Amino acid sequence: MVLDSLGKALSNALKKIARAGSVDEALVKEVVRDIQRALIQADVNVRLVLKLTKEIQRRALEEKPPAGISKKEHIIKIVYEELTKFLGTEAKPIEIKEKPTILLMVGVQGSGKTTTVAKLARHFQKRGYKVGVVCSDTWRPGAYHQLKQLLDPYHIEVFGDPNEKDAIKLAKEGVEHFKAKGVDLIIVDTAGRHKEEKDLIEEMRMISNEIKPHEVILVIDGTIGQQAYNQALAFKEATPIGSIIVTKLDSSAKGGGALSAVAATGAPIKFIGTGEKIDDLEPFDPARFVSRLLGLGDIQGLLEKFKELEKEVEFTEEDLERFLKGKFTLKDMYAQLEAMRKMGPLKQILRMIPGLGYSLPDEVISVGEERLRKFKVIMDSMTEEELMNPDIINYSRIKRIARGSGTSVKDVKELLNQYNQMKKFFKSMNKRQLLRLARRFGM
């Protein structure tokens, strides 16, 4: 989970209010101290923390809750509102207004820029845009091959020449190449060789003058914490069309420091990197981000994930008719497991459900994820005939499947038991209920 330790600490602070018999000044000050401690441990600038928590304390002690809202609920709302304001208030998505829209990506060495270029290309492809990627990184020979490796499976073309040493020439030729192909979006990757902002900004200006991008995006490594302030500020002052993506928020305790430092400059954060996979990039919406961070859920984010699934996995009405008649196969179950896998880590999904927040222990979640992985491996060891007609799977087949998948007979039996329960469940529903369920879960 992105900023897991910070989220747990903030969520625990709010629980003190929720569980208290009554709320007095001493409790408010105690909770404010907990919030201060959590933010400082996440490498948020101390001056910013004190300013934020002073306002939370003032409002919590002075404001009267509106009619119908308890004092506890009002204080939780105040914490939510002030943290949201702290991180930028509103979402500012990248807009594809012109065809083609050109995005220029820059970032210092090790920021995760090239991987982020691939993630961004995939993000827009999933939303129906035709995307082309230009690799103008002439400094690192592996950059072109890295982009090809990441994007070839999704049939996203990468333009580049590992032997060319002129970055500006490559960028210009790449943009012209994709303009001729009529793509909707061109993403230009640049060299990440600079360790200092001023060198980076100089190269950005030179390439910008040649390709005239609609937006320049700085990729910042979330593990650098509050040091991100200097990078973001220099960048914001250098270009009026700049925005920021903060990466590696899944792997650092300093991510909160990086996010708050960037937000303090006023530079808009457009996306955050939430993992290593190509789909682990999400639009940054401060309100939804804070809601998840505090354990309050993110229903809108969950619904968007389901909507994405509708394009990936689609069961026809004929399929649903089959399910109602009890003709639900292991192949259908496999498609569902694959759909769940595409939604992202189970922990990430559960954090979006209001009320669950951080209440489920990590070990429980990891057992659930391991079980799903195991089921998929077991089904990969089955024949097409077994997947389509599970009734033929007798004990000798179970032993063969267990051997082939490196699992136990007990594991295979557990999968078959789960399958039979799902089959029974579908058979017990009427068509209207099943259609509603199908729409909800991307079937």
UniProtKB/Swiss-Prot annotation:
Known catalytic reactions = GTP + H2O = GDP + phosphate + H(+)
**What keywords appear on the UniProt entry?**
Cytoplasm, GTP-binding, Hydrolase, Nucleotide-binding, Ribonucleoprotein, RNA-binding, Signal recognition particle
Question: Where is the major localization of this protein?
Answer: cytoplasm
Q: Where in the cell is it found?
A: Cytoplasm
Q: Where does GTP bind?
A: 107-114, 189-193, 247-250
Domain of life here? Archaea
Which EC class is the enzyme in? hydrolase
Question: Per the UniProt record, which EC number(s) apply here?
Answer: 3.6.5.4
SMART domains assigned to the protein according to its UniProt record, in alphabetical order: AAA (SM00382), SRP54 (SM00962), SRP54_N (SM00963)
Q: What biological process terms from GO does the record include? A: SRP-dependent cotranslational protein targeting to membrane
GO terms for cellular component:
signal recognition particle
Q: Report the GO molecular function annotations.
A: 7S RNA binding; ATP hydrolysis activity; GTP binding; GTPase activity
Q: Which InterPro entries match?
A: AAA+_ATPase (IPR003593), P-loop_NTPase (IPR027417), Signal_recog_part_SRP54_M_sf (IPR036891), Signal_recog_particl_SRP54_hlx (IPR013822), Signal_recog_particle_SRP54_M (IPR004125), SRP/SRP_N (IPR036225), SRP54 (IPR022941), SRP54_GTPase_dom (IPR000897)
The disulfide bonds in this chain are none
Q: Any idea what job this protein has?
A: Involved in targeting and insertion of nascent membrane proteins into the cytoplasmic membrane. Binds to the hydrophobic signal sequence of the ribosome-nascent chain (RNC) as it emerges from the ribosomes. The SRP-RNC complex is then targeted to the cytoplasmic membrane where it interacts with the SRP receptor FtsY.
What does the sequence similarity comment in the record state about its family? Answer: Belongs to the GTP-binding SRP family. SRP54 subfamily.
Per UniProt, subunit arrangement is: Part of the signal recognition particle protein translocation system, which is composed of SRP and FtsY. Archaeal SRP consists of a 7S RNA molecule of 300 nucleotides and two protein subunits: SRP54 and SRP19.
Give the comment on domains.
Answer: Composed of three domains: the N-terminal N domain, which is responsible for interactions with the ribosome, the central G domain, which binds GTP, and the C-terminal M domain, which binds the RNA and the signal sequence of the RNC.
Report what the protein is called: Signal recognition particle 54 kDa protein
Organism of origin = Pyrococcus abyssi (strain GE5 / Orsay)
Its gene name is srp54
